[in-house]
């Protein structure tokens, strides 16, 4: 079952940049999150799934999680406005990886949501970045980094400088960026089993939410919001008995 779920999530992940422009799901009106499950037979999990993301992180179970092992050296090469988010793509031969439970996961892309999708004790952050990875078996792991409004984020400016302002536009990233600078120094985290937060909402995704937020300025947040024209966060979903560990 886990293998099939992982393959479904991988398929959705690999197809997203190509199909997302034609998709009729959205964050507003008849295509908004509460209607996703009825829009397409392939989206039924958005409505019927029991391990959906995002969630509100409140009660947690303390355990001995291994430190998050990140190995980011390449950085992104293009920035895409797909109408749903701003997404950074990497070269197909990237060496950017994380290691979870001894297994390497290769970074596929990363993108942003404003306000945050996951909440902590009911609190939304100004923005949330999702770093999407997969391993050799097709399993998907997503690392979330929160941003609160405050000081300008210098590294984020390297992305924002080439941000496409219209949907279906792609821009080349001209300034080499250090992806490690978009991670907090303290990489302690919460972990739970979840799903993709966009259709088809495939489950079997390892979700990791870093505890310590970064900052971005009000101007940086406004630029993202202007490009999106709307909030792009799915509401939190029921835990349905799931346990969040830390």
UniProtKB/Swiss-Prot annotation:
What enzyme category does the UniProt record give?
Answer: lyase
Which cofactors are reported in the record for this sequence?
Zn(2+)
Q: Which UniProt keywords apply?
A: Disulfide bond, Lyase, Metal-binding, Periplasm, Signal, Zinc
Point out the signal peptide segment. Answer: 1-22
Q: Can you give the residue ranges of the Alpha-carbonic anhydrase domain? A: 23-246
Work out whether the entry's keyword set contains Zinc: yes
Subcellular location as annotated: Periplasm
KW Iron (keyword) present? no
For binding Zn(2+), which residues are annotated in this chain's numbering? 111, 113, 130
General function of this protein: Reversible hydration of carbon dioxide.
| Similarity remark | Belongs to the alpha-carbonic anhydrase family.
Q: What is this protein called?
A: Carbonic anhydrase
Gene symbol? cah
């Amino acid at each position: 079952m886990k293998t099939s779920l992982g393959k479904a999530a991988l398929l959705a992940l690999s197809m997203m940049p190509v199909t997302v422009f034609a998709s009729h799901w959205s964050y507003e009106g008849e295509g908004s999150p509460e209607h996703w499950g009825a829009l397409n037979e392939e989206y039924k999990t958005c409505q019927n799934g029991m391990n959906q993301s995002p969630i509100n992180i409140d009660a947690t179970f303390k355990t001995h999680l291994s430190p998050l092992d990140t190995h980011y050296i390449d950085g992104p090469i293009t920035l895409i406005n797909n109408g749903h988010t701003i997404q950074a793509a990497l070269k197909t031969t990237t060496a950017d990886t994380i290691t979870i439970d001894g297994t390497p996961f290769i970074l596929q892309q990363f993108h942003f949501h404003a306000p945050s999708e996951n909440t902590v004790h009911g609190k939304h952050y100004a923005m949330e970045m999702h770093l999407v990875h997969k391993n050799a078996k097709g399993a998907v792991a997503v690392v979330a980094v929160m941003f609160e409004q405050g000081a300008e984020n210098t590294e984020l400016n390297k992305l924002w400088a080439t941000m496409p302002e219209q949907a279906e536009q792609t821009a080349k990233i001209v300034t080499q960026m250090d992806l490690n600078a978009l991670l907090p120094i303290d990489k302690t985290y919460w972990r739970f089993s979840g799903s993709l937060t966009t259709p088809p909402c495939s489950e079997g995704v390892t979700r990791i939410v870093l505890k310590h937020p970064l900052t971005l300025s009000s101007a940086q947040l406004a630029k993202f919001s202007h490009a999106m024209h709307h909030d792009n966060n799915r509401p939190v979903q029921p835990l349905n008995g799931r346990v969040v560990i830390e």
